[in-house]
């Protein structure tokens, strides 16, 4: 059965909330079941009982994999299953809740449509699921953030037929992934800042040294041991000479975190999830973002989470590996085998390339998602990226020079 884009589904019921080139819409669907490979992001598809097509609810582009849809040729073999009618109004929220940046930057803004709908449908319920069938609970930051926002939710399932399901288009993608987000998104981010006071530091460094404490359950997708700064100890030592305190955002509650960033005077950090918390910082905050090789080439849109502050960049890093396909880079299988065409992540570079292969059902390569591992020869692979998540090291002298310029 063919898969239709959300923006072209049920067009007579679309509600336009922002008349911009991106266009922020709410699509109203009736008598809907959730289907697909599974009902978790990014595989969930929607099927109205009255139509002969499926709907892809994800109005976005996965930048690292250059995909708009995770189904080949926009087709899926839909098999109807018995479903139980569920009355009432629901708002679809099965988005990326595993990767911290994507949750904060891409997922949360869609709540704008939810808040607008509540004005007309006060009993509307948020319909959500984890990002993978093997994950039974959310990371603490997800539940805590929804609590701060005053949003309760129900877990989606594939045996219910939802009487009325509203689906919002993206405020950060929508065909313009590499352009500034909708202004409507900022109203949601402003709601995220808690009311607690904080005695935390005003000048701090967002550490990626997760091995210091070993507590990663509040981190979401954990790349700190893959896109690892090999000499981060030296980075921390240098910054301490300037009164810049090392913090671990994963050890803070969401309310503590948003409060800390809302009062920050100076923030230094390696580009990644921790730095997107600058969304909660005022324009007066000075920030220094340490870029890593090729990261911004793929994820240039990340800058929109930081550039409202007094932002400087430090391009002081280089890869530490020298193999053709770097450790933790993404590759595509091109050799003749049953795996041809699949995308994976390099886990080892000795005696061939050890690769964790995706079954085309994930948007990233979270280490706690189960995947099969295979060994390939170099000629059986081609690069998907040039090592945006590979280990690197900082040039401390250059970093210190860039810091001094910011402090002048």
Tell what function each PLM region has:
Residues 1-330, 342, 350-351, 357-408:
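The feature primarily captures lumenal catalytic ectodomains
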Residues 334-343:
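Short coil-to-beta-strand transition motifs
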